[in-house]
Regions:
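N-terminal leader/propeptide and maturation segments of large enzyme subunits in energy/redox metabolism
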Residues: 56-118, 208-229
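Helix N-cap/coil-helix junction residues
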Residues: 82, 123, 184-185
Length: 229
């Protein structure tokens, strides 16, 4: 009655096309990941149908699960007489929450984001004709994986950073920023290049869920190692 969710249960059925391989696993893992729940059960079915094989594109599996869960969150909020944002704040995952898919969260920004959104003037501004205001929470993972970079400090104080992950959306710029911050030098002193395969150690697949995250960690460790030497 106080708005605290005690348990959550979901059954997901994802269409995989002519062959198995729908993103139902990611949907099941992310469905309740935004919330601090003591009891969770999620069942997923990878359904084969007479259609073309599907492929991943941007957080595969997660938006569909989020749409279903967030729609229910709004319904539950109304039933207990709470605003949707307050209901989410009440149940939001935070640092120390054991996620619905296993790991315990470190520092995450969901709760602070919701609280800031609630305080923003736009959230309380009167609505005009044919206007509405909605909100929802979503989740996606950062994946690690084997990653290798090479960082060299030149005689003129500039830094050459070789990475083995092709640039997708400015990832080289992110690596330069991380290296510069860790080394305590200006950003324009760092140059990142995508090196040949044979010049670096092994790198796992380059995709949007791991490139900046995993290559960034490797860059930071390489910079710290350079400082020690």
């Amino acid at each position: 009655r106080d708005g605290r969710i005690t348990a959550a249960d979901a059954t997901l059925r994802y269409q995989g096309g002519a062959f198995p391989g729908s993103p139902v696993e990611f949907g099941a893992m992310s469905a309740f990941a935004c919330y601090d729940l003591e009891n969770v059960r999620t069942i997923g079915y990878d359904v084969v149908t007479n259609r073309p094989k599907q492929a991943a594109y941007r957080a595969p599996g997660a938006p569909m699960a989020a749409f279903a869960v967030e729609s229910v969150m709004e319904e539950l909020a109304k039933k207990v007489g709470m605003a949707g944002i307050d209901f989410r704040i009440k149940n939001a995952a935070r640092e120390g929450t054991k996620s619905s898919y296993g790991p315990t969260y470190g520092p995450i920004g969901l709760l602070s984001t919701l609280e800031r959104a609630k305080q923003h003037p736009h959230f309380k501004a009167p609505l005009g004709p044919n206007q509405g205001r909605g909100m929802a929470c979503g989740f996606w993972f950062n994946f690690g994986g084997q990653t290798c970079v090479s960082l060299n400090i030149n005689n003129d104080g500039t830094v050459a950073l070789s990475v083995g992950t092709p640039d997708i959306g400015g990832s080289r710029a992110s690596m330069c920023l991380m290296a510069a911050e860790e080394l305590g030098i200006p950003y324009d002193k760092v140059r990142a290049i995508v090196a040949d395969t044979s010049s670096l150690g092994y790198n796992d697949v380059t995709d949007g869920s791991r490139t900046t995250f995993a290559t960034g960690m490797a860059t930071i460790l390489a910079a710290r190692d350079a400082i020690k030497k």
